[in-house]
Curated annotation (Swiss-Prot):
SUPFAM superfamilies: EF-G C-terminal domain-like (SSF54980), P-loop containing nucleoside triphosphate hydrolases (SSF52540), Ribosomal protein S5 domain 2-like (SSF54211), Translation proteins (SSF50447). The keyword Cytoplasm applies. GTP binds at residues 17-24, 88-92, 142-145. Catalyzes the GTP-dependent ribosomal translocation step during translation elongation. During this step, the ribosome changes from the pre-translocational (PRE) to the post-translocational (POST) state as the newly formed A-site-bound peptidyl-tRNA and P-site-bound deacylated tRNA move to the P and E sites, respectively. Catalyzes the coordinated movement of the two tRNA molecules, the mRNA and conformational changes in the ribosome. Keywords: Cytoplasm, Elongation factor, GTP-binding, Nucleotide-binding, Protein biosynthesis. It comes from the Bacteria. This is Elongation factor G. Its main location: cytoplasm. GO terms for molecular function: GTP binding; GTPase activity; guanosine tetraphosphate binding; translation elongation factor activity. Residues 8-290 form the tr-type G domain. Belongs to the TRAFAC class translation factor GTPase superfamily. Classic translation factor GTPase family. EF-G/EF-2 subfamily. It is found in: Cytoplasm. PANTHER family: RIBOSOME-RELEASING FACTOR 2, MITOCHONDRIAL (PTHR43261:SF1), TRANSLATION ELONGATION FACTOR G-RELATED (PTHR43261).
Amino acid sequence: MARKTPIERYRNIGIMAHIDAGKTTTTERILFYTGVSHKIGEVHDGGATMDWMEQEQERGITITSAATTTHWSGMAQQFPEHRINIIDTPGHVDFTIEVERSLRVLDGAVTCFCSVSGVEPQSETVWRQADKYGVPRMGFVNKMDRAGANFLNVNQMVIDRLGALPVPMQLPIGAEETFRGVVDLVKMKAIYWEEENMGMKYTYEDIPEDMVELCEEWREKMVESAAEANEELMDKYLEEGDLSEEEIKAGIRQRCIDVEIVPMFCGSAFKNKGVQALLDAVIEYMPAPSDVPAIQGELEDGTKAERHSTDDEPFAALAFKVMTDPYVGTLTFFRVYSGVLSAGSPVYNSVKSKRERVGRILQMHSNSREEIKEVRAGEIACAVGLKDTTTGDTLCDPDNKIILERMEFPEPVISIAIEPKTKADQEKMGIALQKLAAEDPSFRVKTDEETNQTIISGMGELHLDIIVDRMKREFNVEANIGAPQVSYRETIKKSVEADGKFVRQSGGRGQYGHVVFKISPREAGSGFEFINSIVGGAVPREYIGAVEKGAQQQLENGVIAGFPMVDVSVELIDGSYHDVDSNEMAFSVAAGMGIKNGVTQASPVILEPVMAVEVTTPEEYMGDIIGDLNRRRGMVSSMDDIASGKSIKAEVPLSEMFGYSNQMRSLTQGRANYSMTFLKYNDAPSNIQEEIIAKAQKGE
């Protein structure tokens, strides 16, 4: 079966933004204008089709990235039909993992900014993630009808806060309640959308007289940006002082795809203005799968390889989301980078080294689905029947194995103990947590060996609240949760030599293992390193693996307070063995003893997670907010003026941030907002370390 739409006409885009920049409403309007959803769903009344999990509708925030396929031929039907796959991404800071994994499989992104608050803290976080994956972006300044709306102000913030180069492609006509339409700077025409038919109809008119000069000034800047794309355009621009419409679009497209500029658009999704022109811009300026560099991977023998976006290369895809569906079981969302996959055919999961069979392939529309026979390079689809595949795995042709670049997931920073309300639900809770952990790699489940409690860990309080909530809704398991626990770490400050000796003689065959280590601190974030410096066989080669494993296990279990020990180098420099009594277990135990002995002399310290906190507050509460942050051992790093008052940035230990949202609301009568992201691990002050160690020794 041949392709219906050539790959050049595909666009895989994400819509990313801070909470309340109107991202879900923008997506809804896109679905409406592309003819997929007939009644526009409003986030205000919990009806948006992209927000398809019940909690999202209640909380009015978007949690899971749903993938949707739509088609568009332009506002004036000026293009052949293009296929747009939209991945909706959450804007709440506890769900950055969702954003991270959707960015991984996108070719381009539309970033929504609020016309009043502009670049907010989460916009910066998401922007940095998009930089990491080299995703081309364009901006949509939404909510132009709100009091305080200012398009050019937001452009300036994109320069100042994100260090990017925005290029306005439109200017708004009016703002706040007088916002009526936009000026298209390429065509130099005003566009007005009719309110009666929800913006389905529009008119092109002359630019209002009082705006002509401003539009000419900004058009000049836009043409100049386009000319910088290549020498040919620059020569023509220098000779003639202008470029044709086609040349402007070609130049802007090239620079946008090369991540040099951010074309900027504006509108009000809620008032049905500007979204249709934004869709045209997606087709004109966002890359097709064939425009982005080939994806890199590794073959079985470790050699580097790449896969191009074409049906002729072997099949290779990345699973970027796993979900449990009550009717069909496990759904695996995947992006195909090369080749073709037919329903019912076998695939190879090269990360898990397992063959699997794809039962059915579904094309997803945010909450309805259509079954398809095959899926081709550049497409995003959903597989039913994959049992062992989790987020970030590569699926490929069993005869042409490859591992695509892996996704990186952050370590959780907060843990809570959880137990079912009734003993009968114990098994059900285990199954539910296992399924939720398969869906979300930033959520972990483990059993505490000493207390036998189930511990769940995640990226923030809201993240874990929603997990508990989903267990109740989707799996009918009600749970009690304990107080949140911080994920501390341990490390050392100086190098020492230490030995570990395990000898047991109790009649018959004994046990004997003896190692000498040099234990040294490493740079923050560099992890564990094991060096084997044995010469002359003081420890036989077959036991080296057991020594490394024993050392690593002891470090993971911690030494001073039971927290994982990080950034340590362990060098095996000497040891001894017994011809009869030595075995792997004895050396593993000896290694653990060596680590314990060494660490206690190596100035061990406890590290605590420190969060980057940003509070936006009306000016009159600034003193109270700063005072409260100082009481929480916070270090205020900056205070900036913003449209709604002040923005305060601070670094605060996570252990001091529990219950912060309630305290902040009471200090500011609910008028302040904050966001919090993990920043780094720092040495905890000595009094705090003593408390933590005392608690650990009591077994609390």
